[in-house]
UniProtKB/Swiss-Prot annotation:
Binds to the N-terminal domain of the chaperone ClpA. The gene is clpS. Belongs to the ClpS family. Disulfide bonds: none annotated. It comes from Burkholderia thailandensis (strain ATCC 700388 / DSM 13276 / CCUG 48851 / CIP 106301 / E264). Pfam families: ClpS. This is ATP-dependent Clp protease adapter protein ClpS. GO terms for biological process: protein catabolic process; proteolysis. It comes from the Bacteria.
Amino acid sequence: MAIIPDKQDSTVLERKEQKLKPPSMYKVVLLNDDFTPMEFVVMIVQEYFKKDRETATQIMLKVHREGRGVCGVYTRDIASTKVEQVVTHARQAGHPLQCVMEEA
């Protein structure tokens, strides 16, 4: 805010408009490995990224064939939480599945 004196010895406050930027977005990416079963990857994509079975299977095949697949794009906090949930679930199930986040 700027203080601007007017001609009658009183003060007028002038509010500067703040421009809000949308939050940075992050891709959540699954990485391929030679040990995690394909069906487990499909289940992870369905459970944590709310994809239907067909879409989850397409993402799993992309991970398998290309080495990586994007599961979704989220704000930083949500992406970070999803990465942590996926990695924790994979470790508890005994799988080395890797999940990372990258700026979109």
